[in-house]
């Protein structure tokens, strides 16, 4: 399991299962999953059946064949080339490039609350054609069952944020979008191609971006910030600082120290990944995947 996204269930939702809904998935999974709780410390209860199935996602549900005239998307190729280098010890537990291009799945939910229209919006990614993974959107009235839309929104690992009455997004590999006429338009690229999942936090004119990088040893949670007072085309990410690395056994610290690779990992490893930010009453929480993709943790985050 990986790619967490946490919300406090809004008041407009009736018959809520708990105070908090935590969304996540298997990296190559067949559904978006959800767990609910009344306390961030748990206990968490897994909702049976998930909240959106692959069949209902409008993504591919069967492995596609490679077109004769296939030309790989340049952006996604650079992202894969920058990070696909599995250690021999884990080669059997990481999808091959061909599997990455053909395995139907949906994952990496980004769930936000639209209070004005009283709905819950979820962005998610998966395979739309051979070798091409993209983000789409789904909507729900209760957060328990989502209706997906056909339109492609952007690249994978979408995170959405607001600044000065405009909506923006950030995705792999470092793409900044601005929502214009109801569409997310790419306006900048502020990272190298080795960035994986991210979490975002806006404070005044600063955008804090929490992320991890494929190939790091161990893969850890980093943070860079962006001065948004400038026009988006001039946004630039600061040098990263370390936020969190595996220190506990349940985070993977007792496992071999090896560089990470692009794509899923199907055994426990010495890595933390997939940061997400949740704020409640000015308290900032960092969610992240532990032992590679072998669990989800929550930590309090202090920003000086």
Residue ranges and their predicted role:
Residues 272:
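Iron-sulfur (Fe-S) cluster-binding modules
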Residues 1-108, 112-268, 279-304:
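Beta-rich carbohydrate-recognition and catalytic domains
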């Amino acid at each position: 399991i990986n790619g967490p996204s946490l919300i406090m269930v809004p008041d407009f939702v009736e018959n809520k299962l708990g105070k908090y809904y935590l969304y996540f998935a298997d990296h190559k999974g067949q559904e978006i999953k959800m767990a609910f709780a009344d306390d961030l410390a748990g206990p968490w209860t897994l909702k049976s059946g998930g909240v959106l199935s692959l069949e209902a996602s409008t993504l591919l549900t069967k492995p596609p064949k490679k077109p004769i005239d296939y030309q790989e998307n340049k952006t996604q190729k650079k992202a894969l080339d920058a990070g696909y280098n599995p250690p021999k010890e884990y080669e059997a537990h990481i999808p091959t490039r061909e599997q990455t291009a053909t395995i139907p799945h949906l994952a990496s939910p980004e769930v936000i609350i639209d209070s004005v229209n009283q709905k819950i919006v979820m962005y998610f990614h998966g395979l739309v054609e051979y070798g091409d993974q993209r983000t789409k959107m789904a909507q729900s009235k209760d957060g328990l069952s989502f209706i997906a839309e056909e339109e492609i929104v952007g690249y994978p690992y979408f995170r959405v944020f607001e600044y000065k009455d405009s909506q923006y997004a950030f995705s792999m590999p470092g793409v900044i979008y601005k929502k214009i006429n109801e569409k997310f338009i790419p306006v900048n690229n502020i990272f190298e191609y080795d960035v994986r999942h991210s979490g975002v936090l806006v404070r005044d004119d600063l955008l804090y971006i929490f992320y991890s990088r494929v190939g790091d040893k161990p893969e850890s949670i980093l943070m860079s910030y962006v001065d948004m007072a400038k026009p988006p085309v001039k946004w630039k990410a600061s040098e990263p600082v370390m936020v969190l690395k595996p220190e506990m056994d349940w985070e993977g610290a007792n496992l071999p120290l090896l560089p990470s690779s692009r794509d899923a990992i199907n055994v426990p490893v010495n890595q933390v990944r997939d940061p997400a930010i949740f704020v409640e009453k000015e308290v900032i929480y960092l969610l992240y995947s532990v032992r590679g993709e072998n669990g989800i943790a929550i930590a309090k985050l202090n920003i000086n």
